[in-house]
């Protein structure tokens, strides 16, 4: 159930369909999860400042039941920062990505929790 949310000050209409097609491939490959469970949410046009500047920036949260943690977060970050830089043209030094391990009993899908 990986969930990757991106809040950004880039206008919503500047989020390309190429990004929306590529992101659901990058996230599950990074985590080793099936694409059928991946959710990507992009919130464009947010009033945001990063480092005192209104230049394009996102704040991202990656949530997953397992597959995140100290031993793997650097690998995930590398892939996600590359996605953001390549597709949204956002420099790596203008973004935070938070990785959150969700308890299976705290996430529901199709009428029941995962655990």
Curated annotation (Swiss-Prot):
One of its GO terms (molecular function) is phenylpyruvate tautomerase activity. It comes from the Eukaryota. PROSITE patterns: MIF. InterPro entries: Macrophage_inhib_fac, Macrophage_inhib_fac_CS, Tautomerase/MIF_sf. Pfam families: MIF (PF01187). Keywords: Cytokine, Isomerase, Secreted. The active site is at 2 (proton acceptor). It is found in: Secreted. Substrate binds at residues 33, 65. The keyword Secreted applies. The keyword Isomerase applies. Its EC number is 5.3.2.1, 5.3.3.12. GO terms for cellular component: extracellular space. It catalyses: L-dopachrome = 5,6-dihydroxyindole-2-carboxylate; 3-phenylpyruvate = enol-phenylpyruvate. SUPFAM superfamilies: Tautomerase/MIF. Belongs to the MIF family. Tautomerization of the methyl ester of L-dopachrome. Inhibits migration of human peripheral blood mononuclear cells. This is Macrophage migration inhibitory factor homolog. It comes from Wuchereria bancrofti. The gene is MIF.
């Amino acid at each position: 159930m990986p969930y990757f949310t991106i809040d950004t000050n880039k206008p919503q209409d500047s989020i390309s369909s190429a990004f929306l097609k590529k992101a659901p491939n990058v996230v599950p490959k990074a985590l080793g999860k099936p694409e059928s469970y991946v959710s990507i949410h992009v919130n464009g046009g947010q009033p945001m400042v990063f480092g005192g500047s209104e230049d394009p920036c996102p704040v991202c949260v990656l949530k997953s039941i397992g597959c995140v943690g100290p031993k793997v977060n650097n690998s995930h970050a590398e892939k996600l920062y590359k996605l953001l830089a390549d597709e949204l043209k956002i420099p790596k030094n203008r973004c935070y990505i938070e990785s959150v391990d969700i308890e299976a009993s705290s996430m529901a899908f199709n009428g029941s929790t995962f655990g």
